[in-house]
């Protein structure tokens, strides 16, 4: 009231001689900020999503991601293997579920996963086409020793596809996969040591390619002294990665296909896939026991 009277009756004197500074006392602590609300803010549980391998069946994991979005459930961490790594890696790098679904439906997977010569015939010179037409089997030699390929295909088309998609993503490793929209881990197997190798930094495309490298079908991804292939050999459902980092809720998605019948094993890579399926059965069951939710 006194201040109001001074302003009304002695404005000139007041403003010429007095500087009024008002400093409201503000407590920046979380407790003080929340004290005016009739409820307390609670820290939400951290959610980890674990995606298994499973070949084409891995595309069903897109539906799981859609369900998370539909119910507004945030995902804090993704650890994945093989096809799950491709789906999870694209999502972690900023792709929407609609965009991933569009890729799954519109990509010519027969071409991307082709086991034939990687160079398209339309890209060859005439003499190369003639040589290809005359060749039934091509064997390379190193000196006098024949060079036996490590796999049926180099997998270059798959590498190119993954490189293109990750380059177009909104988020990129810098260099850690923690820098992506969602923290991400790709699980692989070192063909030399037999150990599980968890990739958490570097080239995302290379990590996805390594995790999805089916033995005998695609060449291993060489990284340092390692030769990386499908992580499903040793850790198809890596729930332990989320448990180790202390996530509150672990959701595991198992899209692993069942074992093939005798009539379905007509090619070497189908036999190799069957062997992998047998090897993964018991570890899969143990891994799923560590999850809070299994889909």
Enumerate the predicted regions with their spans.
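Bacterial Sec-dependent N-terminal signal peptides
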Residues: 1-22
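Patatin-like phospholipase
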Residues: 15-81, 89-295
């Amino acid at each position: 009231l006194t201040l109001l009277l001074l302003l009304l009756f002695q404005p000139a004197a007041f403003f010429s001689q007095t500087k009024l500074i008002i400093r409201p006392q503000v407590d920046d602590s979380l407790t003080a900020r929340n004290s005016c609300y009739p409820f307390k803010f609670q820290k939400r549980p951290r959610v980890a999503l674990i995606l298994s391998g499973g070949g084409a069946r891995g595309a069903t994991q897109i539906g799981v991601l859609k369900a998370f979005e539909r119910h507004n459930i945030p995902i804090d961490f993704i650890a994945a293997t093989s096809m799950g790594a491709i789906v999870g890696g694209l999502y972690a790098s900023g792709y929407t579920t609609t965009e991933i679904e569009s890729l799954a439906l519109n990509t010519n997977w027969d071409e991307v996963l082709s086991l034939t010569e990687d160079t398209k015939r339309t890209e060859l010179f005439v003499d190369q086409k003639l040589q290809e037409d005359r060749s039934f089997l091509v064997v390379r030699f190193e000196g006098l020793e024949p060079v036996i390929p490590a796999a049926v295909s180099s997998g270059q088309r798959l590498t190119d596809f993954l490189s293109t998609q990750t380059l177009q993503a909104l988020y990129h490793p810098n260099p850690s996969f923690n820098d992506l929209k969602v923290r991400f881990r790709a699980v692989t197997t070192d063909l030399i040591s037999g150990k599980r190798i968890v990739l958490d930094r570097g080239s995302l495309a290379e990590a996805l390619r390594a995790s999805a490298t089916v033995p005998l079908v695609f060449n291993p991804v060489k990284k340092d002294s390692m030769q990386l292939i499908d992580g499903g050999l040793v850790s198809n459902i890596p729930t332990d990665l989320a448990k180790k980092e202390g996530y509150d809720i672990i959701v595991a998605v198992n899209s692993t296909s069942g074992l093939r019948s005798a009539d379905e094993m007509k090619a070497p890579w189908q036999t190799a896939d069957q062997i992998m399926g047998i090897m993964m059965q018991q570890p899969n069951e143990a891994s799923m026991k560590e999850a809070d939710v299994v889909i």
